[in-house]
Regions:
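Ligand-binding pockets and gating/stacking loops
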Residues: 1-177
Length: 177
């Protein structure tokens, strides 16, 4: 029998829509799976970035909205992380795109999270605050964010040390006390 998303959710027929639809279906099966990864390609926008980025952000937004609607009554048990493995430069290149940069962003949705705030620090855009005068400076290591996530919602003892050997995470403060 085909999966019927909850709450009238509708997933688009694209990479991220199909992937989150599949994850939601497995979550609803209560198989005890604790972690999923989903990829969404196309973000490497070295040329013609404005329309491409608008399309990608729209697809991601609609897919996350459908996922949220679908799993609404289960969101107290779902941690969602949106991240990239690299950032983008602050200025456009000659092809109206951006090249790889240093810092990026991470979006976290989880139960008991201290939401509505930016965690980390904002270095600003002044030339002296940029890495190599062209890149936003990284202020929070993604491993620190992930370490808090595996320690709190997943309640996995020593998970951070197992996942990130030889790394000492800094407190990010993602969760309300």
């Amino acid at each position: 029998m085909p999966y019927q998303p909850g709450g009238g959710a509708t997933y688009e027929d694209n990479e991220i829509g199909r992937s989150l639809h599949a994850v939601a279906r497995v979550i609803r099966m209560d198989l005890g799976i604790r972690a999923f990864t989903v990829d969404m390609g196309g973000w490497d926008t070295h040329e013609n970035q404005p329309p491409r980025l608008a399309n990608l952000v729209g697809q991601l937004s609609r897919a996350l909205g459908a996922f949220h609607t679908d799993l609404h009554e289960r969101l107290g048990n779902v941690v969602l992380v949106v991240m990239s493995e690299f950032g983008r430069r602050l200025r456009s290149n000659k092809s109206n795109g951006t090249d790889h940069g240093h810092a990026g962003l991470t979006i976290v949705s989880a139960p008991r999270i201290a939401g509505g705030v930016m965690h980390g620090s904002w270095p600003g855009l002044a030339s002296e605050k940029l890495d190599n005068a062209v890149d936003l400076a990284m202020t929070t290591d993604i491993r620190s964010i992930l370490a808090e996530l595996v320690a709190k919602p997943l309640a996995t003892p020593n998970a951070a040390a197992t996942c990130f050997p030889n790394f000492t995470p800094k407190k990010v403060g993602l969760f309300a006390t």
